């Protein structure tokens, strides 16, 4: 695992993203959907106390049963800046991943990978630092454009930045808003979408994200006292 160092300011943070982006691996397909383990990571904030709590929940990819889970909390030490949110979240997320008693397998972030102004969102950043295959599944398209996919589960359209496809708008339930899938590290876009569909058997959001969201919110309530 590569050591994370907090940048001193926004300019240094952008320089870190630009430097690490060259280490993103895009020519691996990633593990097959429905095999091994998948891990959801998410964070929750107490802004009044500058507190962040991260959760990591490992599921069996075939059954979606919980295998292991962990949490970590810490102080928020980087300001809220669009495009630099990873620097607020990664220290706690890394700590939560390190506390897991099992290998996490594929990691699913509630956020972006290549679908980022510098092509280096949280999913890519986390992948480069850990060496794990990571995908991003977000609830909104950030600043990118897309056409509405067809109404059926599995329908998708490209998420575009100019002429470049940076992800996909993917329908995970019939007649429900799409989610926005992008590659983080050591996965392909087709495979990332297949994993997302395998993890959304009854809801719009992946089960990994739903579980991690619930756990970090519960842990935040306990940490905030």
Identify the meaning behind each predicted range.
Residues 94-126, 130-132:
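Catalytic-site beta-strand/loop segments enriched in glycine and acidic/polar residues
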Residues 47-103:
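A glycine-rich, hydrophobic loop/mini-helix early in the fold
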Residues 2-27, 90, 139-140, 148-225:
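C-terminal binding/interaction regions
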Residues 79-84, 109-117, 176-183:
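Flexible, glycine/proline-enriched loop segments at strand-loop-helix junctions
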Residues 27-34, 48-49, 100-102, 128, ...:
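Solvent-exposed alpha-helices and their adjacent loops that cap or buttress functional pockets
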Residues 48, 115-118, 142-146:
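Short, well-ordered, mixed-charge alpha-helical segments that flank or form enzyme active sites
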Residues 133-138:
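Short hydrophobic alpha-helical runs that function as membrane-insertion/retention elements
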Residues 36-45:
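Two-metal-ion RNase H-like nuclease active-site motif
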